[in-house]
């Protein structure tokens, strides 16, 4: 049995919900939005600021000079000086450390945040990419956005952002199938997809080819 699972997902694919089901079925820790709070606590910044930098590159917040000081640091990460500011790179560095620590503890499901890249050479980690038909993704996204929003452009933009985030911070191609043990369509149903992933983890080889 693998000791950790990473789930990368297209926006609106239901990958987060599938990850949640798996964590409940296995009794494992789910690291998704909770990572944002852990980063904020480690950096001693407002969780809302950490949320805005989650899975993104430096945005308009950085360009207009948002100056939120990083006043704390995780053990093993050098503390910053008064001249340093919390930004996307800081967010990613702290997230990477939290992912590595979670892997050491084991029994965790890591959603997004480049987990498949951070842990790609660990033989005891199972990597999954969740995708969905375009129509399903649009339907899910429509339920999250305000009326009148350009849903299709929002989803495309989100895909571009995640692709660029993984490329810039981890040097990986987010959509490269070679990063994953399994690609799963949520069209199968979230419960079925979760069960298939767990079964593959339990039956599959412990070492990656």
Q: Which positions does each model-derived feature cover?
A:
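ATP-dependent small-molecule kinase phosphotransfer cores
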Residues: 40-107
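Short beta-strand-centered segment that lines the nucleotide-binding/catalytic pocket of NTP-utilizing
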Residues: 29-41
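Glycine-rich phosphate-binding P-loop
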Residues: 6-23
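NTP-dependent small-molecule kinase module
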Residues: 96-100, 171-209
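Small-molecule kinase domains that catalyze NTP-dependent phosphoryl transfer to phosphate-bearing small molecules
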Residues: 57-65, 70, 148-191
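RNA pseudouridine synthases
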Residues: 102, 108, 114-121, 142
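Conserved phosphate-donor/acceptor-positioning beta-strand/loop module used by diverse small-molecule
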Residues: 121-159
């Amino acid at each position: 049995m693998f000791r950790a699972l990473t789930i990368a997902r297209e926006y609106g694919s239901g990958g987060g919900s599938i990850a949640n089901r798996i964590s409940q079925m296995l009794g494992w820790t789910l690291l998704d939005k909770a990572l944002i709070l852990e980063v904020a606590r480690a950096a001693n910044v407002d969780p809302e600021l950490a949320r805005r930098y989650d899975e993104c590159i430096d945005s308009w917040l950085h360009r207009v000079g948002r100056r939120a000081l990083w006043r704390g640091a995780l053990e093993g990460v050098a503390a910053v000086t008064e001249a340093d500011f919390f930004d996307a790179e800081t967010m990613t560095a702290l997230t990477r450390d939290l992912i590595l620590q979670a892997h050491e503890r084991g029994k965790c499901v890591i959603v997004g945040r480049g987990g498949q890249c951070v842990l790609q050479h660990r033989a005891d980690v199972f990597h999954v990419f969740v995708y969905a038909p375009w129509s399903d993704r649009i339907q899910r996204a429509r339920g999250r956005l305000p009326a009148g929003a350009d849903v299709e452009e929002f989803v495309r933009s989100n895909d571009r952002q995640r692709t660029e985030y993984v490329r810039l911070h981890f040097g990986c191609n987010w959509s490269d199938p070679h990063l994953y043990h399994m690609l799963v369509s949520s069209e199968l149903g979230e419960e079925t997809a979760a069960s298939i992933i767990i079964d593959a983890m339990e039956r599959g080889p412990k070492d990656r080819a």
